[in-house]
């Protein structure tokens, strides 16, 4: 989880043309040189920005917390979504869309898709 998150958050600071080389370098560093265990499967849960913002607001209200410095920067979040999609394509992650026809998919539908992907990978 940390390497994949790192690819997105650190990658968001780079020009798009440099991303493929950065993605390759990061995986080589963390999985090759540092010897971290390489995941057998990565699921990228693709959520649009308005839904992501709504979920963050709900979490903040529910737990009486404030947005961190990154969560307050909507442009940064939007860029991370874009970089996440590029990273998913580069690395071959399995993308699970959380949206369908402009609305969030039902929980059961998302659950079934994720469970099916995991079951197939076992």
Please annotate each region the language model reported.
Residues 3-82:
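A glycine- and Lys/Arg-enriched "phosphate-lid" helix/loop adjacent to the NTP-binding pocket
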Residues 50-122:
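NTP-dependent small-molecule kinase module
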């Amino acid at each position: 989880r940390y390497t994949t998150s790192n690819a997105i958050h650190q990658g968001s600071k780079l020009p798009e043309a440099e991303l493929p080389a950065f993605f390759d370098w990061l995986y080589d560093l963390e999985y090759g040189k540092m010897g971290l265990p390489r995941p057998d499967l990565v699921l990228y849960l693709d959520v649009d920005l308005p839904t992501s913002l709504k979920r963050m607001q709900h979490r903040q209200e529910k737990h009486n917390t404030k947005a961190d410095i990154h969560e307050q920067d909507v442009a940064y979040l939007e860029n991370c979504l874009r970089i996440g999609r590029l990273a998913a394509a580069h690395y071959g992650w399995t993308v699970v869309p959380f949206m369908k026809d402009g609305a969030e998919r039902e929980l059961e539908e998302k659950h079934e898709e994720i469970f099916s992907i995991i079951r197939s990978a076992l």
